[in-house]
Amino acid sequence: MYSTRGKIVCSGVGKSGIIARKISATLSSIGVPSFFLDSSNASHGDLGQLDKNDTLILFSYSGNTSELNSIIKYSNRFSIKTIGIASQKDSMIIRSCDIPLLLPRVKEADPIGMVPSSSTTMTLLVGDCLAVALMNKMKFSKDKFKIFHPKGSIAVSYTHLTLPTISS
């Protein structure tokens, strides 16, 4: 990711897509050009947003999400670097990506063991770890952070100002 000359593009479907969108937002917030690619629109023209200098991160707990097929084929055809995050070692994503990150299979925390909960928490953790590792490599600092966060409670935390409050 550090050597990416273009953008870091994140994609996924369902809850994995929500995690992908969050990781892309985190990367943007530290000054790394990034966006979320909606896999349902990718094969309807949005693949044109990808460039050979980009790095693509695909999120899919099963690793076999059919909506990601066209993105994988396109990235392989045009030699776009891919990172795949999934939990099945024989899955399409793990087999097809340049850098496969294999997650352990986990039992979901809900009463029926099917609602993405433990798996999404783990996927979010891996995505955030990638972002933190990139920040360390970039020698990311508070001064750099201030550039991208001039407003809100995060800005208040480093400016020592107070947020306006509304009283009733």
Residue ranges and their predicted role:
Residues A109, N136-L161:
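Internal, active-site/partner-interface "lid" segment
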Residues Y2, K7-V13, G17-M138:
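Glycine-rich phosphate-binding loops that contact phosphosugars or nucleotide phosphates
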